[in-house]
Amino acid sequence: MSGILELEAKSRTEFGTGAARALRREGRVPAIIYGAGKTPISISLKEKEITKYYRKPAFISQLINLTIDKKQYKVLPKAVELHPVTDIVRHVDFVFLEAKTQKMEVPIVYEGKERALGVKRGGYFNIIKRRVILLCDVNNIPRNVTIDVTNMPIGTSLKSSQVELPKGCSFITKKEFVLATIIGRRGVKTEIEGEQEVAEAIQ
């Protein structure tokens, strides 16, 4: 799980391009928090600190306790603007968290795809979904969904119903969908095709 990140921010009352430039000269980054029917709060963060955390894996799904003028708010990053050359964070949008669950887009890690049974037999691991949208307990937001695919043979599909999700998480849709397949390259028979040919030869 991603855990909770503790950050401190300052409220700000000056806006516009000039005010943003002045903040950046001071080593700070403008940001805003909104959502959950609350009045938006304009804030600033330490540039080096927020850039450091942004560069860590799965920052966009990171639950944050944000302290502003001695008040704490539970928030999630929503959008991050970067400098086009240096990739330093220039602006951050956060959303307030009030509900017990939150819809999150989470990356998928296909563990063992290079050594999957079907790949070893000449197949190609075809990724259909690189991210999935989950409904998560706000205290158990995962950095990713890890799926072991080492036992997948050629000609098979990995479906959502086969995936064990992290505790407190569920797919937002009950309709089954395919995340990945292993397809045979030209001249490589799938295991299903091979079994059919053996059966026909025996008859």
UniProtKB/Swiss-Prot annotation:
GO biological process, one term: translation
GO MF terms held by the record: 5S rRNA binding; structural constituent of ribosome
Entry GO terms, CC: cytosolic large ribosomal subunit
A Pfam family this chain is assigned to: Ribosomal_TL5_C
Keywords: Ribonucleoprotein, Ribosomal protein, RNA-binding, rRNA-binding
Biological function: This is one of the proteins that binds to the 5S RNA in the ribosome where it forms part of the central protuberance.
The family this protein is said to belong to: Belongs to the bacterial ribosomal protein bL25 family. CTC subfamily.
The protein's assembly and partners: Part of the 50S ribosomal subunit; part of the 5S rRNA/L5/L18/L25 subcomplex. Contacts the 5S rRNA. Binds to the 5S rRNA independently of L5 and L18.
HAMAP family in the cross-refs: Ribosomal_bL25, Ribosomal_bL25_CTC
Protein name: Large ribosomal subunit protein bL25
Protein species of origin: Rickettsia prowazekii (strain Madrid E)
